[in-house]
UniProtKB/Swiss-Prot annotation:
It comes from Syntrophotalea carbinolica (strain DSM 2380 / NBRC 103641 / GraBd1). The gene is glyS. InterPro entries: Gly-tRNA-synth_bsu, Gly-tRNA-synth_heterodimer. Belongs to the class-II aminoacyl-tRNA synthetase family. Signal peptide: none annotated. This is Glycine--tRNA ligase beta subunit. It is found in: Cytoplasm. GO terms for biological process: glycyl-tRNA aminoacylation. Keywords: Aminoacyl-tRNA synthetase, ATP-binding, Cytoplasm, Ligase, Nucleotide-binding, Protein biosynthesis. Transmembrane segments: none annotated.
Amino acid sequence: MSAELFLEIGTEEIPAGFLPTAMADLERLIRKELETGRIGFETVRTFATPRRLVLAVTGVASGQARQEVTASGPSVSVAFDADGNPTKAALGFARSNGVEVSDLERRETDKGEYLFVSKVVEGRPTGELLPEMLPRIIAAIPFKKSMRWKDLDIRFARPMHWIVALFDGQVVPFSYGNLTSGNLSYGHRFMAPDAFEVSSLEQYLVEAEKHFVIVDPVKRRQIISDQLAEVVGRCGGKLNPDDDLLDEVAFLVEYPAAVMGGFEDSYLQLPPELLITVMREHQRYFTVVDDSGKLLPRFITISNTRAEDLTVVQQGNERVLRARLSDAMFFWNEDRKVKLESRLDALKNVVYQAKLGTSYEKVMRFKTLAVELAQQQVPEVVELTERAASLAKCDLETGMVFEFTELQGVMGREYALLDGEDPRVARAIFEHYLPVQAGGELPGDDVGAFVSIADKIDSICGCFGVGLIPTGTADPFALRRSAIGILNIILDRGYRLSLPALVERSLGLLADKLTRPATEVAADVLEFLRLRFFNMLTAQGLPNDVVDAVLSAAFEDPVDALQRVKGLASFREEGEFEALAVTFKRVVNIVKGGVDTSVDSALFEADCEAGLFDALQNVTGRFEQFVAEGAYLDALRTVGGLRSPVDALFEGVMVMSPDEAVKTNRLALLTAVARLFQGIADFSKIAA
């Protein structure tokens, strides 16, 4: 027999960002409990609104599956006397397991012959287990932040008000905090707050909707999407697409109603990003554009209540937005009274980080780095890069960014343009913050790219230098994102640069701030970057062992490293690869980091030695040419031609000859071979 398990946790409004993860955790926890408890089930579904988390499991078995267990007992020598009669040890073991001595088995083990007993343990009914299981699940749901309330010794994202727990339509009785489980749920807080009985998921979903609660977030999202399309169509505009906001709003309401509002045309003189930030980030409004993508003085808000006349909702939201935009207009006018560059000195009074100094000091450091990068890579943009770096953080001292911190970079760009700065400088002020998230937009210009790399490497080296290193759970300075950003920018722009040199230069500029030895910091930073690069490449589907092999060989130049990874990954698909990898591994193992590659042909004792030497000389020039061109697949194919002569050497002579001079010469020959392919990858890391 199987039945449905239903659980609803009713709460105060839980933050929208908590709910998708909570749904996933709820499913994970019930699966783990049922599987660990040997209780069969079919499907698990979870739902959430701001005021409830819901779980439904179908096909739940009525009891635990039977389990055959084996218990070990005393050794045979202890269990039986010299005449073969059971001792107290054997009798006690049999009695404790509810069997006769004759039911005990003798088995040979590493320690000798021992007694064992196998028996079938009947499972407990599911109905008995659930009152223990469900409170454990509720307590185990992890939230980024949780709270306590009243004088209760429990924590949850928000205070809990009711619990519905049913198995096969019957209440699963348990207490949690000051609540007792039952079969009563509650409707929408304002539109239908009364209780209603629950008997099953199907009945619950229907009854909840009658009480103005759309429990399924997927359904709510679709309803909102449909309403947005309908409402925006009335004003002749187009919805500014925003799937992330749609996902969030779906968890902000239980019964959505889209409402169109507007604001004065005069506010359209403000930068579009500013208007969108105020509406989207602060009010969770959807923005409206015309056919050309230009913002219209309209917005759409999603209300949590429906009414015949939503004018009051519209007017209330317009009033709130008008106040926000009025503040923005004030800051816009005030900030423009002075030039952006005049704010640079004010950064001397802004602490970037207590041990790393002021924001002004940081700007001076990364300006030096950015200019040097420009000199190395694109000399013609040196002056633009220096100017952009100087202005990059000046908007932090504006009233607008103080009020709307999300607009850092955006306002710097806008104010720079108004001040008559070169458009590439203005663009770089914005772009040096890119990318703002994994897979996000990258700087589209060298000027912004240089400032971005310099700013980010200064942050990483500085934080590592004073012991502010990310942990598994904390990365307050977003150093992982910065590292990934640096690597992506380098790859996107194709810059050929040395990461060790960049890190060393950055640490040199930070010298008086460091609280750790610079050599240790450099090693930690480079390993941090290497791990980020490894994760980036494997996430793209490149084989783990190939990426590891390449990055273990050399990671100085990310562009070169990526070319080597792609070359080796392609070479791996060719028929000779496995045999070649085995041969190369053997070479690496026998030379063990040897450095002497001076070979004396006069010491050769067999044709196979001369054969390998000649083959090595024949391929070296072509190999080095392919490497210089970044044609690593061709380089690997070329060095692959050495497999046969290397194998012949291993078969024809004993490398570790008793003659020390001959042995050294053979090792030097193999070291010269290893030197070629080890510059591409460490083949000992390849799974072959």
